[in-house]
Structures are given as C-alpha cells and as structure tokens.
C-alpha cells in the first residue's frame, strides 16, 4: 500500500454539503486539509431537491453564514428564485428559501474550495480508518493508498451501504448513478459503532417542454431576499425563474392505491424508516386517505436544463406505476420522465457515541457529520460539517471545543438533540424544536453568532465590524424611539410604543414622523421593527434563559459512575451511562429522564464538586 508523503492536520471524507463546510472552515482556520471524494464532478451535488433553506433550515443557513461558513454565499451565487416563507405569520417562523441551479451550485462550490489556501482535494474512495491505540491516525482507500491525518471528519452522506429501491428492484448505490461505500461501514461496525438503517427518497424529474404549465398556479419569487448578511436588499446575479403548483387527481389516488403492494415501502423491501415530514406520495395516500388531492410543486433544476423536480411525488413505486401516476396529475398528462423516483436506504451511527462537538466517543480525533448522524437535509448536514471542521482544528491546536448552545442557535438545538436522543426517523430541523425561537430569528443570526465566527478566524474583521456597527445602531435607535414621545391617535405615546401596535409598521411611522424615524435601510428597518414590536415576549424569553443557564452550564464529569447514585431510577442510570451528557441541561432532555432524576443528579453533582 502506497503512503502519501504529506501528513495532514485534517482529512475530510466526502464532499457533500457537510464535507464542503468542514474542509473549507478547517483550511480557513489555518491547518492543512485533505478532502477525499469518490468523484470530483459531484462536489456539493444537490441529490434531491434543487433548493436551499425553508422553515428552520433557512435559519440554519443564516447561522452558517454568521459563523463564516459558505453555504449562504454559494446559494446566493446560484439562486434562480428567492422567497421568504410564512410572511403572514410571526417573525420567529419566517424563513428564507432559494431555488438554485444545481450545476452552478456545484461549479461555484468547487471553485471556492479549489481556491482555498491549505485545502487539497483528491478523488479517492475511503474504505477504512487507521488508528493508534484508539486515536485516529489516517485513512486507507479502495485504490490502495494510505493518508496520515491528526484528525478525520467523516461525512459519507447516504453512501454507507446505500441501497436504491425502485419497486421490487433494488441495487447498490449512494445515489442514482453513483456507487455506494461498503468497506467503511464494515470497518465502523468492527470498531463497535452502533449502526442502524434509515431511508429517504426523491421524486421523478420531468421534461419541461412536455408539461402544460398554463393550467397551473405560477409561484414567482420575492425581491431583495438572499442568505448572506447585507445592509441593502439583495440583487440576484442570475435570471430568476418561477415555480408552478398543481395537484394530484382522483385518478392518481386510484393508481397508487391499486399498486401499493408493488411499492418498495409497502411491499416490505425497505427496513429503514423514512423522514416523517417528507413522506412519499404513497405514504400520503395511505395516511391521509380522506384527502382527494395533494399539492405538487414543480421546481426548475437550473437555467441550462429542461429538467423539473416534481416536489410532492417522491415514491418507491416501479417505473410503470410512476409513468401512469405522473400522467394522472393535472398538467402532466403528457409529461416525460427524465429520471425515475427512487428510495434509498443507508447506514447511520447512533448519537449516543457522539459528543456535542461531533467527535466520536469511540475513536479520539474522529468527527462525524451529516446524514451519518441520522439527519436529513443539505442545511443540517452543512451546519454539522462546519461544527465538525471547527472542532477538528480545535483538537489539532489543543484548544477548547466550540459548542453553540440551544439557547443561542438552531445549530445548538440540533447538536443537543442528536446527542441526547435515540432517533427513530431521520432528523429534520423545524422552528418548533427550539424553546426560544423568537430569539433565534433568521434576521438576527449575525447579531447572535458573528462574534464566534470572528474569534474562530472564519469571519473577516471588516465583516465583524460591520455587524457590530449595525447591532449598536439598532440598540441606539431602539432606545431613542423609547424616549421620543409624540401624539399618535388619541394619546401621547413613545414611538416605540406606537410601533408595538399590531397594525402599525415601521414604514407607516416613517411617513407620519419623517423627522423622528430614520431610514436605516430595508434590512435594518425590518429588524428594528421586530425587536420593538415583540420586545415584551423577547424580554420574557431572555429572563427565562437566564434562570435556566445554571442548569445548562452545570458540567457532568466524564468519569461519573451513575450506578453509584442509587437514588436515580434504573432507567435514568442506563440512559445517562449510554449518552454520557456533558451538562445537566443536556441530561434533562434525554428521553425517559424524569425531573425527579434531574434533581437527584443535581444534588449528586454538588456533592461531587465538594469532593
């Protein structure tokens, strides 16, 4: 076996969305990085939908940007439609989403990585890990090469023993057209990693020229919406396209119902559990049998292709059923399928062997990120890649780990959830997973997290100073409006009080009091309005967080023997030993741990501290 002459600080295995963030941020932080991928032409490939963001997910992309990651930048460069979802709802659940050109997304990401100093990219398929007495030392590849590394970041996506299903036919693959990885999964099993199966799926792609868009609802984008933090409204660099909405018909339901036994999902071919919030069309027909129709969103895959992503028609039906099903949908009567829908099963590792830093508990220096940890979605994967890359570098330099808390970020919510829960389905981020979501809005991600990005060396001083200046300006304006009183309606009130009324907007106040209300630009105007309008709720959540911080920050020693704490319930002893939470707050969120057990543990920790 040939040994590569260069020893790297960080080796990243896989070049999906997790791997790209891990490789970029590691190199940006000043270490030598090698990224290995089985195909250089599929770097950052959007394997499923041609979109980034959405509810919860868009918040994560903004947080990645605030910390100095690259998903937001590449999305803005590649976007062919930008929207804000939930505009009629409260600010906590409003979220940016972009349709992107799949080819351009790959091209922009590959170019960015290739031009990152300290980052080497190479085509090779990793088959096994190398370690010395439980400490990672490198990897070996199918090609017969060995690479040495102080740390390894594993981001294998759906490739570990990936199995593709189309009806009763199944075959090995990491995604349609790409081989799966067999050796790596076997190597991890031999090392004692608990591994189970999950499933995901993707709908068929259709030829645009064969679709009758005239009978569908057109869905254009919104102006001025991007992902990278800016002071002024975003101007997309690419031409913008519309999506279209149609729906299934009674005939669609009949076709699917008559062929359920031929679905890989319902025919018993699939053992892995699929994502609850992204069900297949056959799942929707069965679970929502009272509904006569289901929405289908037709999303363009790019500017230079006619392929259309049929969002809402994910299925594992055989191709002949897919053909009939597609042609039963309104406007798709003559649709031509360019790529079939399929389901894919893959291996993932249980969260109880992963630290919140995303370092493995079984092999020191091995970090895991993305779908290997049981998540689904590009955004969740990218965020994990960022955290894994940061902490791999911290490991190399013997620095303290970086773990954003669930009180300050959706990324922190995800890290905590993944390492304190046993997943029975792929994990997807929603705003409802956060206890303090009004504080974790998509518009204030930079205010919350940019100081970390700057301290880590991922954000430039210029960018950080801009964020600080904006934060200071918002705070000064908020105080000024609280102290400025004017006649408004029947009474004299502060302008902040006037703005807090539901029917009053910042623009309305600017028109009424042009000498008192400053125009800070559309982006800051909107943020200031939300901060003032919801200040009562925000202040209450901040007080609640302060009261919880003591429990959240109370560290649990790694060598604590839970069996010796006899007042703990047997279930609590077993689950605490299994997950080994870092803090009392994390312990409290493990399923099956009662509040009485937390009280007992708190007393035990205080006694332990005295000793």
Swiss-Prot record:
GO biological process: tRNA methylation; tRNA wobble uridine modification
Primary location class: cytoplasm
GO molecular function: flavin adenine dinucleotide binding
Signal peptide: none
Cofactor: FAD
Assigned GO CC terms: cytosol
Binding site for FAD: 14-19, 126, 181, 371
Purpose of the protein: NAD-binding protein involved in the addition of a carboxymethylaminomethyl (cmnm) group at the wobble position (U34) of certain tRNAs, forming tRNA-cmnm(5)s(2)U34.
Protein name (database record): tRNA uridine 5-carboxymethylaminomethyl modification enzyme MnmG
Gene from which the chain derives: mnmG
């Amino acid at each position: 076996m040939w040994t590569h002459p260069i020893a790297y600080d960080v080796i990243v295995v896989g070049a999906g969305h997790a791997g790209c963030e891990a490789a970029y941020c590691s190199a940006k932080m000043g270490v030598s990085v090698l990224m290995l991928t089985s195909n250089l032409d599929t770097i950052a490939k959007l394997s499923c939908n041609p979109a980034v963001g959405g509810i919860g997910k868009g918040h994560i992309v903004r947080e990645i940007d605030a910390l100095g990651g690259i998903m937001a930048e590449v999305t803005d460069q590649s976007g062919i439609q930008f929207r804000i979802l939930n505009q009629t709802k409260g600010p906590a659940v409003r979220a940016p989403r972009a349709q992107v050109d799949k080819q351009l997304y790959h091209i922009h990401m590959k170019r960015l990585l290739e031009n990152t100093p300290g980052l080497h990219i190479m085509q090779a398929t990793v088959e096994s890990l190398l370690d010395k007495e439980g400490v990672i030392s490198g990897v070996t590849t199918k090609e017969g090469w060995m690479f040495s590394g102080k740390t390894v970041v594993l981001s294998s996506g759906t490739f570990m023993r990936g199995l593709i299903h189309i009806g009763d036919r199944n075959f090995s693959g990491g995604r349609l057209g790409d081989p799966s990885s067999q050796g790596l999964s076997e190597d991890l099993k031999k090392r004692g990693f608990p591994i189970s199966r999950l499933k995901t799926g993707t709908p068929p792609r259709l030829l645009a020229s064969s679709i009758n868009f005239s009978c569908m609802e057109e869905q254009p984008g919104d102006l001025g919406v991007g992902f990278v933090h800016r002071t002024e409204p975003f101007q997309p660099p690419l031409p913008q396209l519309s999506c279209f909405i149609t729906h299934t018909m009674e005939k669609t339901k009949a076709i699917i119902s008559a062929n359920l036994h031929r679905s890989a999902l319902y025919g018993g071919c699939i053992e892995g559990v699929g994502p609850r919030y992204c069900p297949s069309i056959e799942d929707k027909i069965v679970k929502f049998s009272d509904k006569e129709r289901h929405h289908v969103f037709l999303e363009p895959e790019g500017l230079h292709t006619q392929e259309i992503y049929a969002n809402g028609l994910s299925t594992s039906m055989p191709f002949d059923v897919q053909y009939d099903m597609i042609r039963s949908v309104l406007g798709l009567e003559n649709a031509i399928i360019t790529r079939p829908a399929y389901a894919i099963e893959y291996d993932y590792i249980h969260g109880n062997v992963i630290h919140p830093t995303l370092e493995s508990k079984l092999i020191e220096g091995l970090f895991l990120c993305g779908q290997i940890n049981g998540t689904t979605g590009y955004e969740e994967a990218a965020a994990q890649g960022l955290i894994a890359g940061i902490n791999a570098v911290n490991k190399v330099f013997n620095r303290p780990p970086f773990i954003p808390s669930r009180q300050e970020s959706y990324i922190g919510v995800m890290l905590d959830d993944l390492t304190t829960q046993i997943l029975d389905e792929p994990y997807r981020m929603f705003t409802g997973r956060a206890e303090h979501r009004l504080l974790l809005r998509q518009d204030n991600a930079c205010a919350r997290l940019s100081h970390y990005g700057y301290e880590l060396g991922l954000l430039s001083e210029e960018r950080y100073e801009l964020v600080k200046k904006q934060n200071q300006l918002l705070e000064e304006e908020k105080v000024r409006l609280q102290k400025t009183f004017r006649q408004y309606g029947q009474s004299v009130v502060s302008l902040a009080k006037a703005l807090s009324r539901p029917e009053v907007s910042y623009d309305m106040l600017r028109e009424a009091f042009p000498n008192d209300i400053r125009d800070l630009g559309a982006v800051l105007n909107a943020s200031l309005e939300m901060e003032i309008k919801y200040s009562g709720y925000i202040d209450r959540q901040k007080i609640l967080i302060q009261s919880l911080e003591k429990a959240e920050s109370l560290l649990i020693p790694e060598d604590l023997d839970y069996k010796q704490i006899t007042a703990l319930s047997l279930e609590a002893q077993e689950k605490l030993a299994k997950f080994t939470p870092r803090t009392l707050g994390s312990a409290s969120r493990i399923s099956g741990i009662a509040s009485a057990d937390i009280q007992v543990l708190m007393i035990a920790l205080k006694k332990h501290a005295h000793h």
